[in-house]
Regions:
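Conserved helicase ATPase core of P-loop NTP-dependent helicases/translocases
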Residues: 106-110, 115-160
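A short beta-strand element within the Helicase C-terminal
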Residues: 163-176, 200-203
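Short alpha-helical
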Residues: 36, 115-116, 138, 159, ...
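Conserved beta-strand segments of the P-loop GTPase G domain that flank and frequently precede/overlap
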Residues: 110, 153-154, 173-175, 204-205
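A conserved SF2-helicase RecA2
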Residues: 178-241
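Inter-lobe coupling linker of SF2 helicases/translocases
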Residues: 1-84, 88-97, 101-105, 201, ...
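A generic "structured core" feature
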Residues: 99, 108-112, 123, 142-143, ...
Length: 241
C-alpha cells in the first residue's frame, strides 16, 4: 500500500486537524402536534406497522414505512396516485416561528420530500423575504453575496463541493434524513473554511414521532441502516404491547 510505504515521511491529516473552524451548535426544536394531527399520525402508524412481521423487516421495507411516517411528521403525505395530501401545519408553523426568531438572519433550509418544498415556498410567500430553491450555480453565488434570505435545498443536491459559508450560518432541518453522509455533508456547506460565525443546526422534531428516532440515530453516528430497522421494531413492539 502506498500509504504504508510513505508513512515514515508523510502525515495524513483531516481538515479538522489543521483548519480552525467556528463552533457548530445544535438546536433541537420540539414540535407538538395538535389533537387532530396527533390522531392522524397515530392512526396511520397503527395501520402501517401492525401489518408488518417484525422478523421479516428489511432495510427496504423499513425505509418505505418510516418514510411515510416522516412525511406525516412534516405535515403531508403522498397518496397512492402520488398526490400530496396535507394533514397538518404544525411543523410549518414551528418553522415560521423559528424564522421570525432569527430576526432577518439568513437560513439554509433542508427539506426531504417535494411536498415539503412546495408547502414551504407557499408559506414563505406571505413574508417579505427573498426565497430561492437551490437548483444551479447562480444560487450559490447569490446566496454568498447576501441576495437570498431563505435558501431551500434537498441535502442530496448540495453535498460535496458546494460552498455556502459566506451567505449565512443557520441551517434548518425541516425534513430529516436517515442518511448520515447526506446529513453531515449538508451541514458542512456552512461549517467550512471561511465561515466567520458559529454555525447553528436547527432540527424541527415532532414529539412522539419518527423524527425523534432519526435525530437519535444521527447523533449516535452509528449504522443508520440498522438504526432504521431497530426504530421500526421498537415502534411495532410498543403498538403490540
Amino acid at each position: 500500500m502506498i500509504k504504508q510505504a510513505i508513512s515514515d515521511i508523510c502525515i495524513s491529516m483531516k481538515a479538522a486537524d489543521y483548519l480552525t473552524l467556528p463552533d457548530m451548535l445544535v438546536n433541537n426544536v420540539p414540535v407538538a402536534l395538535d389533537a387532530a394531527a396527533a390522531k392522524a399520525y397515530s392512526q396511520l402508524e397503527t395501520e402501517l406497522l401492525l401489518q408488518v412481521d417484525e422478523d421479516m423487516i428489511t432495510a427496504g421495507s423499513a425505509g418505505v414505512l418510516t418514510g411515510k411516517l416522516l412525511q406525516l411528521c412534516n405535515g403531508a403525505i403522498y397518496s397512492e396516485n402520488k398526490t400530496a395530501v396535507k394533514v397538518h401545519d404544525c411543523k410549518i408553523d414551528a418553522f415560521l416561528e423559528l424564522i421570525e426568531q432569527l430576526h432577518g438572519q439568513h437560513a439554509l433550509v433542508f427539506y426531504n420530500f417535494q411536498h415539503d418544498r412546495d408547502r414551504l415556498v407557499e408559506a414563505l410567500a406571505k413574508y417579505d423575504l427573498r426565497v430561492r430553491v437551490y437548483s444551479q450555480a447562480k444560487d450559490e453565488q447569490d446566496w454568498n453575496n447576501g441576495e437570498i434570505d431563505i435558501l431551500l435545498a434537498h441535502p442530496a443536491s448540495c453535498g460535496y463541493g458546494l460552498n455556502l459559508q459566506r451567505g449565512g450560518h443557520h441551517a434548518i432541518w425541516f425534513g430529516l434524513t436517515w442518511s448520515l453522509e447526506q446529513y453531515e455533508q449538508a451541514n458542512k456547506r456552512l461549517h467550512r473554511q471561511g465561515q466567520e460565525h458559529p454555525v447553528i443546526i436547527h432540527h424541527l422534531i415532532v414529539q412522539g414521532g419518527m423524527d425523534e428516532q432519526v435525530v437519535e440515530a444521527l447523533e449516535n453516528k452509528g449504522d443508520m441502516q440498522n438504526a432504521l430497522m431497530d426504530a421500526l421494531r421498537v415502534r411495532i413492539s410498543k403498538l403490540r404491547s
